[in-house]
């Protein structure tokens, strides 16, 4: 978005120096974004340094920025500057489902010719084109901004959107008590809160949100403003009816799983909060293609279907396994933990999810956790 607004953008990264994912860096260069080694040489006076949570103080670019006295922002602080504007903004939070919901809302608005700006954590297939192969962000009208927001580092406390959406709350990067506090404050800061009432944790938080600003949705929650009924799950999608007041619309999805039906119901509620009609929102989702690495079928050979999925916490794994279990065949699961830190926090719960979700003839393979460098404690690995 900054580059599209005529701002100058440059950057570095460990992956660039290591020669990984060169096609992604080539794409950035094609947008006019300058790239340089992460050795401090690219840092110049007048720059603002924006860093992700993984960038440590010892990184040469950070050292150079400090020596030059440059303004420094974390990625969430920079996103908050864009999101906390007096304009229609919608932020999607929650432990699971926020990337999919953000993609669904973005697509609904686009299909209704609203031209949103969308910031997501995954590639949205509907927006992929030859000139934009990595469509995890869409630059549109700066006056309509939809973004996924993350709670893993506590930075969700920075955001003050017009509309805050909460999908669910479960164990992930932080303890439950802290998550309840972070998400509750997130909803209360917004003018309107869109909340999944089927999730016990989010429902409890919704009870403290003023009734006139809370928009509830759910399949099993009487009193929800957006109610899902007649849910039919199929191998390649689902169908249900959404009821909102005196209106009702049938919804057809081509992404599988009960969790995605819930995601779609929430996306409809959020889009309607932005002024989209129920009919338009439901109709647009029939053409939603999904996200990369979210139960994405890579191909089939010799009777074996290969599926790529990003599930990395107990809740996500439960949903993925439940969706796969509903289809015939044995499961051969290769699961790489999302990092040494998350494995240390959730190892027992992850083991329980697999123990309960896999059948006797299924197989689970565990390589070492993801590690891209840094000083994280690595004494416990996948041999847990």
Language model feature labels by segment:
Residues 1-20, 26-34, 49, 67-70, ...:
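ATP-dependent carboxylate-amine ligase
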Residues 7-10, 46-48, 143-144, 189-193, ...:
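Short active-site oxyanion
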Residues 10-15, 113-120, 217:
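Conserved RecA-like helicase motor-core motifs
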Residues 12-16, 47-48, 51-54, 75, 163, 192, 195-198, 219, ...:
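Structural motif
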Residues 29, 43, 53-197, 201-213, ...:
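Phosphate-binding loop of NTP-binding sites
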Residues 34-45:
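Short acidic low-complexity segments
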